[in-house]
Regions:
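PRPP-associated nucleotide enzymes
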Residues: 1-147
Length: 147
């Protein structure tokens, strides 16, 4: 699930790679940190949904999208976020939301409240970053790591 049109290309590539359907959240942003889900494009009823995004700051868009998916009878809602900034009130929003599990990377050092959340799992990308740095140092291809 793409939580907004800005992530559609990445979400489509992931959906193709894992052979699943794509849905898009059509949202309206009234001002910074305030968004409203206008429509869901695609079928989500009785499906396990995975929200894909590059960054999550206050979790407003993410939790609104999760609520909209559940209101359309999604079976479950997971989120994969590359960079979990998770500024206040993100943790509180996530804990109160219908998100079953949120996966973030350790690209940003997680605070204790993030580490202690039952809904958030941290996936280490340290080995990948280390390998990329090593390849750059040795003038080897980095793009093959992501093929």
């Amino acid at each position: 699930i793409s939580p907004d049109v800005g992530v559609v290309v990445r979400a489509r590539a992931i959906a193709k790679r894992v052979n699943c359907d794509l849905a898009i959240i059509d949202k309206r942003r009234e001002r910074a940190s305030v968004s409203e889900v206008v429509n869901i494009i695609g079928e989500v009823s009785n499906k396990n949904c995975i929200l894909i995004d590059d960054i999550c700051d206050t979790a407003g868009t993410l939790t609104n999208a999760a609520t909209a998916l559940k209101n359309k009878n999604a079976k479950s809602v997971y989120a994969y976020i590359t960079h979990g900034v998770l500024s206040d009130p993100a943790i509180e929003r996530i804990e109160k939301s219908p998100i079953d599990k949120m996966i973030i990377t350790d690209s940003i050092l997680p605070r204790n409240d993030v580490i202690n959340s039952d809904k958030i799992e941290i996936l280490s990308i340290a080995p990948l970053i280390g390998e990329a740095i090593g390849r750059i140092t040795d003038n080897r291809s980095v793009s093959s790591l992501f093929a």
